[in-house]
């Protein structure tokens, strides 16, 4: 007979696409609105790799306001059409809205005294643009700890972010 599984003492969540709406939806929306072939932006991000604008922004090396110029460079490198990195980043940040069912689940876990953590790839804002920061402030009471790639200088899937 199978042994009963013990209740967890802690649960780790990603934010984008789990607790918050997915940034991938915002990327797809940007492509659709601008008549860009589907998956173009993901190809640019992938081809640029760890030295590309997106990876650098997620490590906090450049802010959301500094993203547009290096992203345009990444687009040129892979032969993609010119893309408005500022508009793209705005859509991504606007997509950072909570998923009500996940907020409810987090509340249940907290009420059950189960530790909760968030591990997220995010971006460093600058004064006057606190959309993602505001989302984090609103979520803070639901987590014992939030680990942010832009603060740690390392992003998922790099194993160092897990230690």
Predicted features along the sequence, with ranges:
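Short beta-strand/turn micro-motifs composed of small residues
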Residues: 120
């Amino acid at each position: 007979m199978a042994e009963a599984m013990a209740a967890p003492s802690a649960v780790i969540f990603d934010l984008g696409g789990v607790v918050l709406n997915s940034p991938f939806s915002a990327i797809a929306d940007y492509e659709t609105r601008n008549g860009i072939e589907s998956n173009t932006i993901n190809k640019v991000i992938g081809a640029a790799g760890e030295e590309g604008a997106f990876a650098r922004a997620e490590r906090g090396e450049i802010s959301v306001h500094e993203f547009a110029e290096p992203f345009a460079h990444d687009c040129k490198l892979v032969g993609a059409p010119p893309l408005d990195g500022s508009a793209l980043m705005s859509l991504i940040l606007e997509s950072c809205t909570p998923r009500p069912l996940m907020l409810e689940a987090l509340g249940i876990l907290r009420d059950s005294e189960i530790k909760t953590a968030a591990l997220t790839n995010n971006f460093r804002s600058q004064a006057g643009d606190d959309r993602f920061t505001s989302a984090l402030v609103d979520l803070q009471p639901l987590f014992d700890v939030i680990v942010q790639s832009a603060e740690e200088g390392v992003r998922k899937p790099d194993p160092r972010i897990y230690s």
